């Protein structure tokens, strides 16, 4: 499913856990204003190197997702392709609180995570019910899984 073709993405996009940065770069090439964050300094260095020769609307930052105070209400769209399900259980609440902080009432969050029913990929990841509960506790209302 292509969120761009479906018209689901809006101007200011956050790519959470942006390695290998192809989503951030692709969306920036289409004119979206994109911020790509990853906790890995190496991932961000690679992303910056890849985009250094491109004119683009993408800004990469090495950050802990739970520390995005300067972006209050900034993002129209957040995409998370595999970040949330790979963080520690103890980081779920700070992560979802940050989502609530950086989004506004009309923002959309697109979260892709491993499924417990896909046994070939399942490696003690937390289930979707746990994700949904953490998101609801922090008032993240628009969510596509």
From Swiss-Prot:
It is an enzyme of class 2 (transferase). The keyword ATP-binding does not apply. Probable methyltransferase. The keyword Transferase applies. One of its GO terms (cellular component) is cytosol. Its EC number is 2.1.1.-. It comes from Schizosaccharomyces pombe (strain 972 / ATCC 24843) (Fission yeast). The lineage of its organism: Eukaryota, Fungi, Dikarya, Ascomycota, Taphrinomycotina. Keywords: Methyltransferase, Transferase. This is Uncharacterized methyltransferase C1348.04. It comes from the Eukaryota. One of its GO terms (biological process) is methylation. One of its GO terms (molecular function) is methyltransferase activity. Belongs to the methyltransferase superfamily. Pfam families: Methyltransf_25.
